[in-house]
């Protein structure tokens, strides 16, 4: 029997990827963790494969790297070589990489070191910093399959604008990371490369659709990754792996020439943003990009420089806090002199319904077309999200307009609710930010069809939103209380997925911080404040 086209494509792509891992960076069979070993976050330190210097370099933040390279203390070559090696190991343990650019990266690092030695200065604020990119971002000469077998062996002829601008600022491209087929799943799985695993528990997902980036960054195989977010695709992975991240409002980060699904769907815009281990790295990314004036290349980019004055926060802040969204069910901030008030969020069900109608306005035709091209199947989790594509009907123009009008009315209603908090904050201002869960549960088991998450509000209303780590699952404290009762059918489904803390051992817990539109500077500053107050240690 002839093998289906998609299986042949997948086999060839995987062989191509593995051939680019140097033999000296391959894990010896005697050292490779057995499948039942779920926690591999500490493998680099315990394996004997890395020198103390390599461990020191890869554990640094992006801000540390750029600072030390700019003074000549570190070289771009040694940093790049170390992180490429760690990414190679991450791939073997976590299956998080799609495209490998190690040779090109090291060659670029040599060029940057030569420039620094000759000129005595850096080429830009990101000089020598290796940055990993979600598979969506086009890098000339490499595929951007976004999980579809039908997109394989079609290398990009030019870089995405964001890639060009970051390279211009001194960044080094060395790897692209795994995503789910369709880009519309909360787990990074596709038929080409397979499933990405969580380094803290390989039986758990890193989320999606930027799950490959999350695996790389949390494993210290990337200093800073670039993900995207249309309904939680950056925030969910950050929450599942203990990272900081930022979903900016549309227009702050260039999205030009990025491979994507749902092309032409502009009612809810996908945005690119940073994923990292420190909030200072969000600032480094955003300010460095703004300094390149992306609006001169990308007509969708707003002519808005990084506004340092907006990072200066009032002495006392007030945060709204929502335990859920009314559909699926702060002590240290108060101790630090800030106020925290309840924010009754009841829009969840309406937001989710509007989003789903927008994403399936074509009746699922695009997803079906791109899988039919090679005969590959859609995963059960995608079928779950689509509500089984065969049952979805394309929206009429009238229905689409009506749905977009609902979005406009909801935006006004939410703004009024935000403004109405002014009388309760004690600061003579409305709340400065809204803290709420990113998901109704910590990192889930592989193959889970998600009943619900909390990512849609920010995406639908285009609100600047950050993510920050809080804690990890505690096997003793996090059992389901006997007195718990669900708010809705979806709420019960969410708790059924959680079931018991043992299913989420070593999983991390993150929250999201929602600001207003185009408040990237303020939200980034508040993430730093929250980090300093919480002093998270997991």
UniProtKB/Swiss-Prot annotation:
Top enzyme category: hydrolase
Location of the region described as Disordered in the Swiss-Prot/TrEMBL record: 1-32
Keyword 4Fe-4S assigned: no
Record's keyword terms, sorted: Antibiotic biosynthesis, Hydrolase
Catalytic activity as recorded in UniProt: a monocarboxylic acid amide + H2O = a monocarboxylate + NH4(+)
Keyword Phosphoprotein: no
Pfam families (UniProt xref): Amidase (PF01425)
Pathway note: Secondary metabolite biosynthesis
A GO biological-process term: antibiotic biosynthetic process
Leader sequence segment: none
Transmembrane stretches, start-end: none
Homology family: Belongs to the amidase family.
Record's protein name: Putative amidase kk1C
Organism: Curvularia clavata
